[in-house]
Amino acid sequence: MSRFAAAAFFVLFGLTVCFADAAAPRVLPEGKQPNDTRLAAPKDLNGYFPLVMPQSKEEWAKRADVVRRQIAVAEGIWPTPERTPLNVVIHGRIDKGDYTVEKAYFESVPGFFVTGNLYRPKNKSGKVPGVLFPHGHWNDGRFIDIGRQAVRKEIVIGSERFENGGRSLLQALPVQVARMGCVCFHYDMIGYADSTQLSFELGHRFAKQRPEMNTTDGWGLFSPQAEAHLQSIMGLQTWNSVRALDFLLDLPEVDSSRIAVTGASGGGTQTMLLAGIDSRVTVSFPAVMVSTAMQGGCTCENASCLRVETGNIEFAGLFAPKPQGMTAANDWTKEMATKGFPELKQLYTLLGAPKNVELFANTHFQHNYNYVSRAAFFGFINKHFKLGVEEPVVEEDYDRLGRTELTVWDVTHPKPASGDDFERRLCSYLAEASRRQFDALQPRDGASLAKWREVVGGAVETIVGGMLPAKSDLEIADQQVTEAGNHTRFTGLLKDKSRGAELPAVLLQPSNWNGRAVIWLS
């Protein structure tokens, strides 16, 4: 410290300040902690995640930008990754009379494939709406078949209508969407159906660390290196959704002004996140997911830094004021009508579009995307896309396709590489691609410095939970003044009102102060 001719010490510390030659001055009694939100019990996915209502449109616009950036940073897609060639393959067209079904796959990043089925209407001219359909944690995903006995039980309680079509709730939706005159891409969640490059166990059941994947070079997901690089299953799924939207919009018949995304459960998570960060989506319909309660019970729905001082209600709010519908059931969404949705309605009202948000609460059903919930979606897009289908829109039965008819892989289109080595290569590629982007941002002049601060500074702000508080947010509480010979000691609690932070602090000011200061953080 000899380089500083300082005689004033401003000391910030957790509980006490330690000096070698004197008893440590205390701000709080022994054993008492500051009333700091960061010292509270950690909030887990089953906590309470309400929306804090903004007071003005301007306040919300600023907050929305912060939350969108937080999502992107947490998911490792900040700045937006390079959009590499999709290398689209569409094959195996099946004609079902009034619609067709095709097998489609493409690369979201080089060597990593998004797989699914493309449903298209027949006998349509001109541009038609496009619908993205990510699915949740339904057994076998896109290939789901709940069987004859199970669907009969669903029919008895009014959850499904048809014994054949009801066996696949996931196939029923895109069929009806195509019959209504829309193109629908139904794609796999990582680890489901044809998306097997990263396994189901890795993506959705990870619980035990793998020493062989926790290396400083050639690491895998869920490792310290992957977390440090913000690489996650959730980030990969979100990027898959962004590229699925690229794919959909590249289809010549799709109307870019009428793009919807819908999914239930984990598919609802994917829906609200894509709709929240990608402005190209014009209608969003997350089913049985948006709530103030449980935020997503799978590793694929969580990422480091994601839900810090935010949650799913606010994520859904990012889509306002554009049309958004959602469903509730007898699950964690059962209280949406009184907790969460009223605040979303207030937000839409603030933004001048109170009629653009709707909740379809069918809490007499368990967790679902059943016939009744699908009907709500069909009516919603019929209204907002002006499809002209007679109301009420009634879903009809269809000829259900099996696994062999839906799978994208065959002798001519073999499965791509998978397993641990592929996982290592994927993580390595993502890290190197990100490094190239940040290297390109190195400031060279005033304009590039501003961009560096926006991108890199923005990432740092998200990761550390904010930057310097405004002066107006700071105050000293419980201040005490003690004369101690050649100096005066001030103690108190330095409060940051904007974050609920509270730091014990000591200020030592000499009698003959020279106007210079040293800050000691301990």
At which residue positions do the language-model features occur?
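Positively charged n-region of N-terminal signal peptides that target proteins for export
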Residues: 1-4
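Bacterial N-terminal signal peptides
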Residues: 7-17
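Alpha/beta-hydrolase-fold serine-hydrolase catalytic core, especially in secreted/extracellular enzymes
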Residues: 20-114, 327-504, 508-518
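Cap/lid segment of the alpha/beta-hydrolase catalytic domain
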Residues: 126-127, 131-242, 249, 290-300, ...
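Loop/turn elements at helix/coil->beta-strand transitions in domains of secreted/extracellular proteins
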Residues: 127-130, 180-183, 255-258, 279-283, ...
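Flexible loop/turn segments at secondary-structure boundaries
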Residues: 138-141, 192-196, 267-271, 291-297, ...
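The feature captures the conserved acid-bearing segment of alpha/beta-hydrolase catalytic domains
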Residues: 295-352
